[in-house]
Amino acid sequence: MNTFNKNYWDKKYKEHKTGWDIGDISSPLKSYIDQLTNKNLRILIPGAGNGYEVEYLFRLGFTNIFVVDIALQPLKNIQKRIPNFPKENLIHSNFFDHYEKYDLILEQTFFCALHPTLRSTYANKMVELLNKNGKLVGLLFDFELTENGPPFGGNIIKYIQIFYSNFEIKILEKCYNSIKPRKGRELFFIFEKK
C-alpha cells in the first residue's frame, strides 16, 4: 500500500482513526520551542496533522509558521481550532512538491509515516527547504524498522546514515521527556544544514 496518499490520510482524519494524535503538543517539542527567542523565524511543520505545535507557536507570538499537508482534513481542523491563523500558511500539497525556504523545520511523526524507501528523498528535500544554517528538529521513533507501518521505525545508526551527508548532527539521543506511551521509543534530534 502507498501510505503517502492523500485519500488514505484524509480518511484517517475523517474517521478519527488517528492513534498517533496525542491531543496536544509533545513535551519534547514544547521544551525546544520554549527556548526559542526569535519570533520571526520562518518555521515549517510538514505533515503536521492536527498541528498542536502550530497552535502552540502561534499562541506564543511566532509570526511565520507554515504547514504543508497532503490531507485537507487536518488543515481544516487547524483552521477551526485557530481561526486567526493565516489561511494562506496552511498549504494543501504534497510535501515533495513544496519549494519555499525556512529557518526551522519541526518534525513530529511525519518522517515515520513515510515509507522507508522515501527516507533519502525526505532528507534531500529538507536540505533544499532550509536556509543556510537552518535546522531540522524533532523526534524520530527508536524501534526496529519493519514493513508493518506506518509508523515506520529505525535506530540511531540508520538515521545517521540517512542524514549525515547533508546535516551536522548536533543532537541525536534518547528522548528524556517523551510522553508515557512513547517513553524509551523516541529519539530527540537537532540537525543543522551544512
Over which residues does each language-model region extend?
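Class I (Rossmann-like) S-adenosyl-L-methionine-dependent methyltransferase catalytic domain
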Residues: 1-100, 114-194
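Conserved acidic residues
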Residues: 103
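A conserved beta-strand element that flanks and buttresses the S-adenosyl-L-methionine
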Residues: 106
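Short catalytic micro-motifs in class I SAM-dependent methyltransferases
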Residues: 109, 113
